[in-house]
Regions:
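Acetyl-CoA-dependent GNAT
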Residues: 13-16, 21-98, 110-112, 116, ...
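Structural signature of beta-strand start/N-cap positions in the alpha/beta core
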Residues: 7, 57, 99, 123-124
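Conserved glycine-rich acetyl-CoA-binding loop
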Residues: 93-111, 118-120, 131-138, 142-143
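C-terminal "cap" of GNAT-fold acetyltransferases
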Residues: 87, 123-126, 130-186
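Conserved N-terminal entry element of GNAT/NAT acetyltransferase domains
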Residues: 1-17, 21, 178-186
Length: 186
């Protein structure tokens, strides 16, 4: 169906409306899982692309010039305010247009994030997700990411919103090594 090549590029300000649409659409499925008192601050934070761009780089996945995915890259994950150590890189807000799910967009974005982390000299690439984001958790574990409970975050407390239900953000990380050089077929 979507057999076109996926490429990742830095986002431009003109891309922000499309990115926000993808974020709203991709995260809408979690409105029942996220405590209602926290949903508003969480979505506002995800959609604050200017702040994410100020501290990192916004990336978009593109197929035939259409934006089909997004992720924010933080060369210094400690600036995110989630307790990551200095020297680690981080990601935030990974989202894929639902019509392009299952076609490698998330994996392509993760590869681009890891490549940027290596280029920045980071020894670890880290991010948070939630247990109810089961498809994402399965992808991360399949790719070799490890749980790091020491860095889990209480999202309700992070946003300063008391909620009846707890919402832990689960920390995942991957220790980075040099990417193997491509082999030439002889």
């Amino acid at each position: 169906m979507h057999e076109q090549a996926i490429r990742v590029r830095p986002a431009e300000p003109a891309d922000h409306p499309a990115i926000r649409d993808i974020l709203r659409t991709a995260y809408r499925q979690y409105t029942r899982d996220i405590p209602p008192a926290v949903w508003g601050p969480y979505l506002t934070d995800l959609l604050d692309l200017d702040r994410h761009a100020h501290h990192g780089q916004l990336l978009v996945a593109v197929v035939d010039e259409a934006i089909v995915g997004y992720a924010a890259f933080y060369p210094d994950a400690s600036v995110q305010g989630f307790g990551w150590p200095a020297g680690w890189a981080g990601g935030r807000g990974l989202a894929v247009d639902p019509t392009f799910r299952g076609h490698g967009v998330a994996m392509t974005l993760l590869t681009a994030l890891e490549d940027r982390a290596r280029a920045a000299g980071a020894v670890v690439f880290a991010f948070h997700t939630s247990a109810f984001m089961t498809t994402a958790v399965a992808l991360y574990e399949r790719l070799g990411y490890c749980r790091a409970p020491r860095f889990d975050v209480d999202v309700n407390a992070h946003y300063g919103v008391p909620a009846a239900r707890p919402w832990p953000a689960l920390a995942y990380l991957r220790r980075l090594t040099a990417r193997p050089a491509a082999r030439n077929a002889a």
